[in-house]
Regions:
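C-terminal transmembrane helical hairpin of 12-TM major facilitator-type secondary transporters
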Residues: 265-309
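Symmetry-related core transmembrane helices of the 12-TM Major Facilitator Superfamily/SLC fold
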Residues: 159-175, 357-373
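Juxtamembrane intracellular "pre-TM" segments in multi-pass secondary transporters
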Residues: 1-5, 178-211, 390-395
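Helix-loop boundary and gating motifs at the non-cytosolic
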Residues: 2-51, 199-239
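Structural signature of the two symmetry-related core transmembrane helices
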Residues: 72-86, 164, 266-280, 361
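Hydrophobic core of transmembrane alpha-helices in multi-pass small-molecule transporters
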Residues: 16, 94-109, 290-304
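Helix-to-loop junctions at the C-terminal end of transmembrane segments
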Residues: 57-69, 151, 250-263, 348-349
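Cytoplasmic helix-loop-helix junction between adjacent transmembrane helices
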Residues: 101-138
């Protein structure tokens, strides 16, 4: 018991250190390569590879968690995160493509969420999962401003080595102190999809469409558009940092006081319907200040919806096969991200920035409509969910 009380902080340290690096790359990659004349579509392809890998990552991670155990999978992910940062030392786009794809496969969210499911009391899980995922966004924001500042004074290689040190230290801490857990249910890969409850699939699909909407303008278009408005790379990093820190704080604190008596299904539909006009408003925001106001309005609504998605994700996942249920959910929640990034890059180059926001509005609308298929109230009655459950083995 003494050992397990530090489990969530150790997992959070590793998860947030990986998010720090991912956040830095969100700023470093588009700014660095755009300054060297690389086209928007080619930069978008780098992020497309990352998002494309995220489609396949959850099932791979889920199977590894189910077969290898939680600790070995978590440490392996952090170690690879550290190693591939060195790929930027090789002046060849092949290694950049490889780094983007491999980093996308290292989906730390599921590696962390399984620990929340099994190593925390059920009444605390809603807050802990939203705190972990919310402050992950804040860590990403800190990485963005850190990356923007460091790339201004250091080479891209040295900048990435600094961030690699954070994940390396987190991996060493996990090796020493993180407990292991083995799931007893071992399901054949080809039977996973059919064994997962329909409500988890519906929830994942809806959140996937919402994620696709955000990434359609928030990954490549946002930093490039801000640069197009004449702002400095440091300002771009500051805006993106503030955006993600804002999201992280909203998710974390809103989850503490959210009223779960409100039906999540209706709230998710309402949030989606409100985001449609906000997405369209981005295309009409002609000045920098107005544009930023609309961006943060979008992030406020998105973050509020995210609290309910995160809560229902943990609530719907079974204790016996947590990793496989979450693998299905996160696969669906990631499937539209590369589509949003890649298609918006083509649309922007062909028709202008406004088309990225039109695409975003379309994704949001489909997300809201998908919520109609969710159950009217959470019906998950499974009370097994902490490290004492008989369906798992702690080591």
């Amino acid at each position: 018991m003494e050992r397990t009380k530090w489990t969530i902080p150790i997992v959070a340290l590793g998860y947030w250190s990986a998010a720090l690096t991912n956040g830095a790359l969100r700023v470093i990659v588009p700014i660095y390569f755009a300054s060297r004349g690389v086209s928007i579509s080619k930069i978008a392809f780098l992020f497309f590879l990352f998002k494309f890998a995220e489609i396949f990552a959850p099932f791979g991670i889920g199977v590894m968690l189910n077969r290898w155990g939680y600790k070995r999978t978590f440490i392996t992910g952090l170690a690879i995160h550290s190693v591939i940062s060195a790929f930027y030392m090789v002046p060849n786009f092949f290694f950049l493509y490889l780094e983007r794809f491999v980093r996308g496969l290292l989906y730390m969210a599921d590696m962390s969420a399984v620990y929340v499911k099994h190593f925390s009391a059920k009444e605390n899980q809603r807050f802990l999962i939203n705190m972990m995922l919310g402050l992950k966004e804040a860590s990403k924001g800190v990485g963005m401003i850190g990356g923007g500042l460091l790339i201004a004074i250091l080479t891209i290689e040295n900048t990435l080595l600094i961030f690699a040190a954070f994940t390396a230290v987190s991996a060493l801490v996990a090796v020493k102190y993180l407990p292991d857990l083995q799931e007893q249910v071992k399901m054949p890969v080809l039977k996973i999809w059919g064994a997962v409850d329909r409500k988890i699939k519906t929830l994942g699909l809806s959140f996937g469409l919402l994620n696709g909407a955000l990434d359609a303008w928030g990954v490549v278009v946002l930093p490039v558009y801000l640069t197009h408005l004449g702002v400095t790379p440091t300002f771009v990093g500051t805006v993106m940092m503030a955006e993600y820190v804002f999201q992280g704080l909203i998710v974390t604190f809103f989850s503490k006081y959210v009223n779960l008596r409100w039906e999540p299904r209706k709230l998710l539909m309402l949030a989606g319907l409100l985001l449609v006009p906000v997405s369209l408003a981005l295309s009409f925001a002609a000045t920098l200040h107005l544009f930023l106001i609309v961006v943060f309005t979008y992030m406020f609504l998105f973050s509020g919806a995210m609290v309910y998605y995160n809560h229902l994700m943990i609530e719907f996942a079974s204790a016996e096969k947590t990793s496989l249920d979450l693998a299905t959910y996160t696969t669906l929640s990631n499937i539209f991200k590369p589509i949003g990034v890649f298609v918006s890059g083509i649309l922007v180059e062909s028709f202008g920035f406004g088309w990225a926001y039109y695409l975003s509005a379309l994704f949001v609308l489909f997300s809201a409509l998908t919520c109609i298929a969710l159950p009217k109230a959470a019906t998950q009655k499974d009370q097994a969910g902490d490290y004492r459950t008989e369906s798992v083995t702690v080591r």
